[in-house]
Amino acid sequence: MSTSSYIDQIKNEISEKVKGRAIIAVSGGQDSSLLSVLASQVLGDRLLCVFVDTGLIRIGEVDRVRKFFEEHAMNYRIVDASKRFLEALKGITDPEEKRKIIGKMFIDVLNEEAENFHAEYLLQGTIAPDWIESGGQKRDTIKSHHNVGGLPKEMKLKLVEPLRDFYKDEIRAMSRELGLRTDLQPFPGPGLAVRIVGEITPEKLDLLRRATRIVEDKIESALKPEERPWQYFAVLLPVKTTGVHGDRRAYGYTVAVRMIDSIDAMTGTFTKPSWDLLEDIANTITDEIPDINRVVYDITNKPPATIEWE
């Protein structure tokens, strides 16, 4: 099938399955952005696009998503639920528990928005790798996906997943066909929660946001879009090590930098960047964020590792 045929297939499914009002959670990533545009074309004012600020997002994320909504003349709401999410995650260290809590909180917020909008349907941008990792069709569960394993069994909304059988390369091809950005990196639904190993605190979130911005800025400044890794980000580890600031001993956090090349997210190989780029990233992080004094580079492929650390 051609890319345009895939687009027609998705729009037909939305038209057939959604008979009333619907909402969609838009993260600003490739999958939900594509689905929100297609659903908007089909449903018009019967669709409400919701962006939930969980407090686990990157610097500038809210402004970027608002701009996207307005550029495409969408019916939207931005909900600041950051206090609720951070309170629910207090003291939680297990990655699966984090994902389940975030999934439940997310659905609670969406149910509230759906009730206010009188929506009966929830559109989700779940794609094939999401449910495969979550144990779909007799596969062992690798980890619960926020669009799959984190959802409560009893939902008030009827779930519609038009992208369920598509892979990331197909999503990008459809986005290209529609004139949407195709350089958007995948960003996990649980956000920075799965890039902080261990308990999530406001201090750790601040450190990781700043480190993430440095990693993204350095790579995007050094490399043309076609040269960039498929995904690149920072991970804050629950490990403190001894370092030196000036002539004084310092005890600071460790950050891992992850760069991965992939086509469909099912497999991936670690990127082999120049030493100069890695050195620039490490020096900038440790210079600008004194509480981080060590930077390591993840050289693990998928498999055996997953792309995200948690």
Curated annotation (Swiss-Prot):
Pathway assigned in UniProt: Purine metabolism; GMP biosynthesis; GMP from XMP (L-Gln route): step 1/1
GO cellular component, one term: cytosol
Annotated GMPS ATP-PPase domain residues: 1-187
Pfam families linked: GMP_synt_C, NAD_synthase
Keyword field: ATP-binding, GMP biosynthesis, Ligase, Nucleotide-binding, Purine biosynthesis
Domain of life from the UniProt record: Archaea
Protein name: GMP synthase [glutamine-hydrolyzing] subunit B
Organism: Thermoplasma acidophilum (strain ATCC 25905 / DSM 1728 / JCM 9062 / NBRC 15155 / AMRC-C165)
GN (gene name): guaAB
